[in-house]
Amino acid sequence: MYLLIVFLPLLGSSVAGFFGRFLGSEGTAIMTTTCVSFSSILSLIAFYEVALGASACYLRIAPWISSEMFDASWGFLFDSLTVVMLIVVTFISSLVHLYSISYMSEDPHSPRFMCYLSIFTFFMLMLVTGDNFLQLFLGWEGVGLASYLLIHFWFTRLQADKAAIKAMLVNRVGDFGLALGIFGCFTLFQTVDFSTIFACASAPRNEWIFCNMRLNAITLICILLFIGAVGKSAQIGLHTWLPDAMEGPTPVSALIHAATMVTAGVFMIARCSPLFEYSPTALIVITFAGAMTSFLAATTGILQNDLKRVIAYSTCSQLGYMIFACGISNYSVSVFHLMNHAFFKALLFLSAGSVIHAMSDEQDMRKMGGLASSFPLTYAMMLMGSLSLIGFPFLTGFYSKDVILELAYTKYTISGNFAFWLGSVSVLFTSYYSFRLLFLTFLVPTNSFGRDRLRCHDAPIPMAIPLILLALGSLFVGYLAKDMMIGLGTNFWANSPFVLPKNEILAESEFAAPTITKLIPILFSTSGASLAYNVNLVADQFQRAFQTSTFCNRLYSFFNKRWFFDQVLNDFLVRSFLRFGYSVSFEALDKGAIEILGPYGISYTFRRLAERISQLQSGSVYHYAFAMLLGSTPFVTFSRMWDSLSSWVDSRSSFILLVSSFLINKSSQE
């Protein structure tokens, strides 16, 4: 049963890929959706047996690589962390498959699309179930490849091509860091198996001094692993690919942002918690990076006009919350927020897809407005998702986001306070852009064309069913799972993840945190909603004043241009590497030294020599006699010296040189 959870999506993808031409769009959609749905049902059974029954399951299938000290096998690990991720991935993926049946019904390449969705799901399941770093890396690279194929699905669009290449290249930076971290684990522990590495993590580690700094082997490995998470989970510095990934179909965006790809980095940190717990330096770095990411993405999203990009930046901001929750050693709360976030983020993306699908692929919110009457169901769904996103009391997001902020405050460290205040301010911006999205899309006077309004319609039944199910999850999952997953004294995470006793602060955040810290997120959410209402619906004079102010214009450009991260990366990194690649690698090395000293240079030298020799052929007898004399003289001299030279000159080399010279001379004459 456990193996079927992983391999059923692979079966559906294989059938869609090899027989999609014969099954057609409907047959392929039914096959892939059925396989992923069965996998989702089996995930619920596994959740009952493993998480609720507190019995982890280890499956060792077959040996994979065995070379001296290196031994890797095909194995699967099903513990509490794994089964939670299985439910998230398979449930969201099955709803996205069902949604795509209607959304992609008019696309002639829908069988290929369903094939890509299923293989994406398979690689994510392979990532979360692997019991060693090598298998995790296989799934890690697989989801990167599948995301490239899905973002690049409409390959005739230039922006989709550029976005897919950008996602692939930016993620290669993080993948390189993850690979170095895995190499470091093997060097230090002589294995890539999770259980062995985690059991030995507390043993004495190697330390050395570099640039007057004391470095620890575990710290270095954790930093390298975190670089992998920075790339995959779109943290500050490597986050630029995430908004551009919106060029793919909307179901792809929902799957990437809710259940797969971006959650892989958070999962990897939670899985490697026994390593990170013994590296306080790495935890501090993770906390600062996550807090800065949440603030950066929240401030960037407030002035975006693309419907999907606003939701994409909200994903980036929420990933920052998950990351700095891991940095303060509360991996269970981070995974809980990941699960809650999957429901309302998939709901937001699929609701946005319903609007875009009905509005003839229009994504600019400024060209919408007044759609609440035409899309009552979609408006209600997006309202529920937005309220859950901002942490409205008693909705799903409220039970995880507020706990993360309380934990950051009760950490009583510089990094914890930094994360608390940046996270709290990010709540204000999150509330602002969430309600701005609702106002500009559904409530302001209409700005769309009349012909678009005549054709628009609410979500059809196949698209409405996933929205309703996700809305129920956005309303009740946090309340139902809170006590089980992050309640005091719960045994849910008995086998994974691991937290040192000195880092346990959940009880302190529950009872020792001041009341004001519990009210700050609610106050900021209310303030953000009120500000969005006043700016976008009421105060036209505020907008005019904002447009005429030089400072406000510069601030608008700064946030709208995404803190100029793309420009900085292009000017200082991309163009520098392009210049280096052309002037040094191409001109100086490839077309320079390698060609001159390589085969081209040797052939050119012999060819020029043969041309000079051929000029001696003048047709005069005395010239030939003189040439014979010049040729015989060194020959006679050389034959006399042969006995002394034969000890260090190879006669075979001399023969080869003589014959090659003759052939080159003959070819030059022809």
From Swiss-Prot:
GO CC terms in record: mitochondrial inner membrane; plastid
InterPro entries: NADHpl_OxRdtase_5_subgr, ND/Mrp_TM, NU5C-like, Proton_antipo_N
Reactions the enzyme catalyzes: a ubiquinone + NADH + 5 H(+)(in) = a ubiquinol + NAD(+) + 4 H(+)(out)
EC category name: translocase
Localisation per UniProt entry: Mitochondrion inner membrane
Keyword hit for GTP-binding: no
Keywords: Electron transport, Membrane, Mitochondrion, Mitochondrion inner membrane, NAD, Respiratory chain, Translocase, Transmembrane, Transmembrane helix, Transport, Ubiquinone
Function: Core subunit of the mitochondrial membrane respiratory chain NADH dehydrogenase (Complex I) that is believed to belong to the minimal assembly required for catalysis. Complex I functions in the transfer of electrons from NADH to the respiratory chain. The immediate electron acceptor for the enzyme is believed to be ubiquinone.
Protein name per Swiss-Prot or TrEMBL: NADH-ubiquinone oxidoreductase chain 5
Organism: Triticum aestivum (Wheat)
Gene name, Swiss-Prot/TrEMBL: ND5
